[in-house]
A protein has these predicted regions:
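Glycine-rich anion-binding loops of enzyme active sites
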Residues: 154-161, 177-178
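Nucleotide-binding motor/catalytic cores of P-loop/tubulin-like NTPases across gene-expression machines
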Residues: 176-179, 184-187, 421-424, 428-430
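Terminal-region recognition feature
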Residues: 1-146, 152, 164-167, 171, ...
Length: 512
């Protein structure tokens, strides 16, 4: 049967499994279903569902290989009573999650469901708790959990295992929501608004990371797992990257090159200066873009991604110069999205790289009512105590609290034309001198240059620009990528307790 326009054709659980996993690698974990006493009517429904689908429940579970990597899989079968979850289906799902956790396997989930199985009532409804608890333990063990939402996914399934992924993607055109349209109309006497409960709309609002057709699932999952599951193998992947060329700059190199503070500020504002997107395209591998807070917010001023530099895995938080403008400056949602990235790094014990490049956070009623100041505070709080290794880079403009929110890392790097200040120099000049005409003088006095920050012990290392990243974008991005690979390898090799103690000591004694 053909699918409606824009929607992927429906695949049953075995067909989707076989499309994603390496041929011949599937091993089922399913045990025979054991049910308590049920009504004759329900027993007949179960028998018909089993006959129609050749499955004994709405969940299949097992393991296989994805591009050679061993993974655990749980998938829904919509043909079995609309994929609804009752006690037996939940038990199979929970047992599979627990086994994946015990065996240290990444878990791939492919929900498709109308929700809770109404024939089993409240006891089925409460299975959401047990499922969620099992997934929470899996994530607490530092193991990846990837979710592919299929058409349709509703109710208790979306409100439990469908919404807990480290990475969440969905079928094109999939209907996804909490309350189904038919139930809504029956309860409220009017149709549910169109085009709300769609995969594309959820992606637009930062609730899922991407819309991905069936044939691309394996590639996206493989790239994600190359990063998410790499903490235990990083030492094999970074061999040869620990010592980049001397011309890339080192901690000990005095970065003074005679640029004035105003020259640096001006260079950082060039329209053609490479930003986070150019850096990822040029110097990173296994990049998987993520999107939004997962809670209904998305800010184009912040880019969240998984990536590797020189083989070292990391979560990337980059302030995107192309996504910020006078009409759409960096807002509180961007910082909430940044905090999602911090949580991801923490859960998976991955390094976090922050790339700072902002003309400043939003100054508006919406930003104030959206809690901008509080989000800056929470970013600072989370970064300072984050157990994951952290690396900050002043890539360009570093204006105000929006920049500061991503600074307090284990190691801080700066591009030669990167800078950091409490306000734009023009703003500082207006406060002190009641005119913007002395902005260059204020920039010099405030010590905003990468060179000044290095001398003050705020920046550990300055990455050269020859003479300006905008004039050598590819070469600069490759240079910075090599440095990031070296720095990440160094951070991954340090003892966590010592590293965090050193970080806290560093920021306690800044300026002394």
């Amino acid at each position: 049967m053909s699918a409606p326009s824009g929607r992927s054709p429906r695949l049953d659980a075995p067909a989707l499994r076989d499309l994603v996993l390496d041929p011949g690698s599937w091993l089922s974990w399913d045990s025979p279903i054991v049910r308590g006493e049920v009504s004759e009517e329900y027993a007949a429904e179960l028998a018909r569902a089993a006959e129609q689908t050749s499955q004994d429940e709405a969940i299949i579970s097992g393991e296989g290989r994805l591009r050679g990597r061993r993974v655990a899989v749980v998938a829904g079968e919509f043909g079995f009573l609309a994929g609804s979850i009752g006690v037996a289906a939940a038990e199979r799902l929970i047992a599979a999650v627990e086994r994946a956790t015990d065996e240290g396997l990444p878990l791939l989930a492919a929900p498709v469901s109308g929700g809770t199985r109404m024939q089993e009532g409240t006891v089925a409804f409460l299975q959401m708790i047990g499922i969620t608890a099992a997934i929470a333990r899996h994530k607490e063990a530092g193991l990846p959990y990837l979710v592919y939402l299929r058409n349709p996914t509703f109710g208790g399934v979306l409100a439990s295992w469908g919404s807990l992924g480290h990475v969440t993607i969905a079928e094109p055109g999939a209907s996804i929501g909490f309350l189904g349209a038919r139930v809504y109309q029956a309860l409220y006497g009017e149709p549910f608004p169109q085009d709300v409960q769609t995969a594309e709309n959820l992606a637009e609002h930062g609730l899922i990371d991407a819309v991905v057709p069936h044939e691309e699932i394996a590639d996206v999952a493989d790239r994600a797992l190359r990063v998410l599951a790499a903490r235990s193998t990083w030492h094999l992947d970074v061999r040869g990257t620990e010592h980049p060329p001397a011309e890339d700059g080192t901690d000990a190199d005095d970065p003074e090159d005679g640029r004035s503070a105003w020259d640096v500020v001006t260079a950082s504002r060039r329209e053609d200066r490479p930003g986070v997107r150019r850096l990822l395209r040029t110097a990173a591998t296994d990049v998987v873009g993520l999107s939004g807070t997962g809670a209904g917010e998305r800010d184009p001023g912040l880019l969240l991604a998984l990536a590797r530099f020189g083989g070292a895995p990391c979560v990337v938080l980059g302030q995107d110069r192309r996504g910020q403008s006078m009409s759409a400056p960096l807002g509180p949602a961007a910082l909430r999205e940044a905090r999602r990235g911090m949580r991801l790094a923490e859960e998976l014990r991955l390094p976090l790289v922050t790339l700072i490049d902002t003309p400043g956070a939003a100054l508006s009623r919406e930003a104030e009512e959206g809690g901008l100041a509080g989000e800056i505070a929470r970013c600072l709080h989370d970064l300072v105590v984050l157990r994951a290794p952290t690396l900050a880079v002043l890539l360009g403009q570093g204006t105000g609290g929006g920049a500061l929110a991503l600074v307090p890392a284990d190691r801080v790097l700066a591009a030669a034309n990167g800078w950091l200040g409490p306000l734009p120099p023009e703003g500082a000049s207006a406060i002190v001198h009641r005119t913007v005409d002395r902005a260059g003088e204020m920039a010099a006095k405030q010590g905003v240059r990468a060179t000044d920050l290095w001398r003050a012990g705020i920046v550990d290392r300055v990455v050269p620009e020859r003479p300006d990243a905008a004039d050598e974008p590819t070469e600069f991005c490759l240079r910075l990528g090599r440095v990031l690979g070296e720095e990440l390898a160094g951070l991954l090799g340090r003892d966590d307790t010592e590293r965090i103690r050193t970080r806290l000591h560093r920021y306690r004694h800044l300026g002394h």
